[in-house]
Every structure is written in structure tokens, then in C-alpha cells.
């Protein structure tokens, strides 16, 4: 379940002016990347759905950020279908981005 409303996500993106995008298959490296980005002033972070274990890494990263840096808004990108979007939403994605407009994903 998302920790931030749609309006909070949008406002944070507008205020920051950028959304860093990344993927790493190693949970510990992903945590370090997220912490470094947060230390650099970014408040919104997009984790891309690119590897076999991406959902697992995302879930662990979301748990970590909820504890260590609860002001970071974590979302997911490279989502092309509704089942994958639902999986990430259930894992605390605050926003979902895809390379195309999929009405099924938008309904979620």
C-alpha cells in the first residue's frame, strides 16, 4: 500500500524537479543508491522493473526506506501490464510508470 497520496507524489516531483531512475539486482547496493540519492536532495525515486529479481529487490528497498528514510517516495517504472503493476502496488509502490499508456494499468 502506498504511503503517499497522488498529490503528494506530484508535488514532490514538481518541487524537486527531477526523478532519479535506477535498477540494481543487489539489494544492498540498491539501498546504498537510494540513500545516496536522498542525501543528494532528491525526494522521489523510480526503481525500474528490469531484472528477474526486481520485485524482490523493490520490496526489500521499500521496507528499508520506510524505516531509514520515510520521506523518500519510491515508485516503479518500466511497467507494461496490470498484474505487474498490482504486484508493485502491493509492495508499497507510490507511483507506477510505463513506457506506454496501458488503460488496465491506469485503472489501478
Show where each model-derived region lies.
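Hydrophobic, well-structured mid-protein blocks that either form specific transmembrane helices
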Residues: 83-108
Amino acid at each position: 500500500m502506498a504511503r503517499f497520496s497522488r498529490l503528494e507524489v506530484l508535488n514532490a516531483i514538481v518541487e524537486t524537479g527531477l526523478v532519479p531512475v535506477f535498477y540494481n539486482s543487489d539489494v544492498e547496493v540498491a539501498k546504498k543508491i537510494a540513500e545516496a540519492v536522498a542525501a543528494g536532495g532528491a525526494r522521489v525515486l523510480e526503481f525500474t522493473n528490469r531484472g528477474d529479481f526486481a520485485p524482490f529487490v523493490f520490496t526489500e528497498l521499500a521496507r528499508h526506506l520506510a524505516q531509514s528514510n520515510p520521506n523518500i517516495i519510491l515508485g516503479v517504472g518500466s511497467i507494461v501490464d496490470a498484474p505487474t503493476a498490482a504486484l508493485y502496488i502491493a509492495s508499497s509502490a507510490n507511483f507506477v510508470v510505463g513506457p506506454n499508456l496501458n488503460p488496465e494499468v491506469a485503472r489501478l
